[in-house]
Amino acid sequence: MDVAAFVISCLSLVVAGLGTWLANARAKEALEEARRAAADACWSKLQEAVQRLIGFDPAAEPINDRLTNLRIAMTELVEKLGDEWKGLDLWLDSERTLGVTFGRLVMEQARSDDSIDRRLKSLEPLMFWAQVLGQNLRYLRSKGHDGPALSELTEHATSMTLSVHEQQGWEPPRTSNPRVRPLDEDFPRS
């Protein structure tokens, strides 16, 4: 009788251990799925913000809200993907700066007496930029992190921004603010 009780106890222990292991495995899968769903939502929100810039005329209505939504969606995606996507923050910031540059270009070139064809022609840089940004976002979302591609895209957006500023005789965009410093060990805390 003691042997039977011992065997049943051992079997119960094995079943309980196996059940716990399976429950933990399923919980990890569910957590990973939830993380993927949250990241997918951020990708979609950014794509929506980009799509709202295609066909948009900043000479007809303010561009501020659309650029703010774009910046917020970019920030959320960078924060959600974290350190696994090194370089994404730099690329998205350079793209945002390029979008602001094209928005300014469109607004400065617009005239109240523009024909439809002229207006559409002046919108091309902003629309084309938004279309290409959307394509690059879809590519990266489907392929996954690609450090060399992100570096190349960052360099391209930065050089395009500087080129437009130079062509228009504008000052280059600021890349930093001397009044803002990152918090680190050398920064005095109060």
Which ranges hold each PLM region?
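An amphipathic alpha-helical interaction surface
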Residues: 64-190
